[in-house]
Amino acid sequence: KPKIGCVVMAAGNARRLGEKKLAAQLRGRSLILRALEAVPAEKFDKVVVVTQYPEVMRLAGEFHFAAIHNPHPDYGISHPIEPGLPALRDCDGVLFQVSDQPLLRRESVAELVDRWRTRPEKIVALGHGGVRGNPCLFPARFFPELLELREDHGGNTVIRRHEADLLLLDVPAEELRDVDTAQALEELKAEEQV
């Protein structure tokens, strides 16, 4: 059975929302807590959380996830891949999950992993209406390309080179919604009140 790892990318300096982005609350639960709760741990051989925040490291420990310190949060979106992926180099596939999709459901992530197991040569991502979102699960053959990424080039760069290898699992649009600005978070809170 293929070994699958998960990298939760909780490392960004969140320039647009300030450093407390991951602590921002929606319905009484922080974005980082929601992100960790959305990880179907039983589907993975190992889960690592890449962050520079001690409180996130502590929270990762409560979930029995490994925490990896991100020494260069200013380096851009590729950087969590660099410390996260080597910790999972013995895996056959690795899923990359962001921490600013507060409505992402763990059931959807579990279904994504199950879909990948049926087509382990493919990159599998959540999507809606044919538009790709996160998370994405990459087979090991793409690890070298992921490790070559620099600065603000994330996994998207690799996917664009290999569109024919991409499979999308359709989920409701709300699950893919990211809150990377204070305004986006306030809009989401306002909608939740309706």
What do these predicted regions represent?
Residues 7-11, 50, 97-98, 126-127, ...:
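Short beta-strand segments
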Residues 74-140, 144-147:
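Conserved beta-loop-beta/alpha segment of the NTase-like Rossmann-fold superfamily
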Residues 1-54:
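N-terminal glycine-rich phosphate-binding loop and ensuing alpha1 helix
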Residues 22, 46, 66, 165-167, ...:
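Conserved beta-strand segments of alpha/beta enzyme cores
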Residues 2, 144, 148-194:
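Conserved alpha/beta core of the MobA/IspD/sugar-nucleotide pyrophosphorylase nucleotidyltransferase superfamily
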Residues 18-21, 26-30, 51, 71-79, ...:
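Residues at secondary-structure transition points
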Residues 33-93, 107:
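Conserved N-terminal catalytic core of the sugar/cofactor nucleotidyltransferase
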